[in-house]
């Protein structure tokens, strides 16, 4: 009973006051880890349009950005990044706002602009390149809001407590300090596959975001990072099995699993 009271007190403090304000060193650490996962750390992938997708991916987090009029099941994150930067008075190209759609309507148009090094492409690339610390800071802010967002979708109080406990077990050391590896794991997965709260991010009514990973963690696995990685692999395997065959998601399994292996402590 005493443990439960202590946990609820600490849980409440963590949820309300996480305030993941990263130091410059932590921003650099997160930026490099996430960017290595998303684009192998190579500048040529800072603005990219993957084969088989109808949208572009930008920055260290490969934040999704839609062309004008495009509707997609996945969360459009790049406008959220721009809004975060605008709040901090970050200089941007004059044509760029959080409401601006991706400047090119098709991958062919984008590739012509990239290969031709058009002015719009140059300005966008320079902006992305110069703001990587802010992008890392945005990733931390997004994680900061992830647990409250997840808990709002859960009605059962015991389940809320379980999910919060598992989240905090990854993020914090026993003394309440932030575990930097756990910080990376959570930031990377939320950026990679989302919070798991968006109803459109489902196949056959089954999601694959952070919520679903936390729900399916094996409580008997003593290594917290292995437990998270194993659950994430299971959720993404389920996603592949449920995905429309025309999307060909099996081709991503190996790369996804390699990414999830970086969550293990070597």
Language-model regions, residue ranges each:
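N-terminal secretory signal peptides that target proteins for export/translocation
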Residues: 1-2
């Amino acid at each position: 009973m005493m443990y439960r009271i202590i946990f609820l007190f600490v849980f409440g403090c963590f949820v309300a006051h996480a305030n993941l304000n990263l130091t410059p060193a932590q921003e650099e650490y997160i930026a490099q880890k996430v960017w290595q996962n998303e684009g192998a750390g190579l500048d040529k992938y800072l603005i990219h349009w993957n084969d088989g997708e109808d949208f572009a991916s930008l920055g260290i987090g490969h934040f999704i950005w839609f062309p004008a009029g495009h509707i997609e099941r996945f969360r459009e994150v790049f406008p959220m990044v721009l809004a975060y930067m605008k709040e901090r008075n970050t200089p941007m190209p004059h044509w760029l706002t959080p409401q601006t759609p991706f400047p090119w309507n098709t991958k062919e148009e984008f590739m012509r602009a990239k290969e031709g090094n058009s002015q719009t492409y140059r300005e966008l690339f320079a902006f992305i390149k110069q703001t990587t610390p802010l992008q890392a800071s945005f990733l931390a802010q997004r994680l900061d809001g992830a647990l409250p967002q997840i808990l709002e979708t859960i009605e059962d109080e015991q389940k809320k407590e379980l999910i919060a406990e598992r989240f905090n077990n990854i993020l914090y050391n026993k003394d309440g300090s932030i575990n930097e590896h756990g910080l990376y794991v959570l930031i990377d997965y939320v950026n990679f596959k989302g919070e798991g709260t968006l109803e459109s991010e489902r196949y056959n009514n089954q999601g694959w975001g952070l919520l679903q990973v936390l729900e399916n963690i094996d409580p008997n696995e003593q290594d917290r990072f292995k437990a998270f990685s194993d659950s994430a692999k299971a959720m993404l395997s389920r996603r592949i099995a449920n995905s429309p065959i025309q999307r060909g998601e099996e081709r991503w399994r190996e790369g996804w699993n390699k990414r999830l292996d970086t969550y293990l402590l070597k």
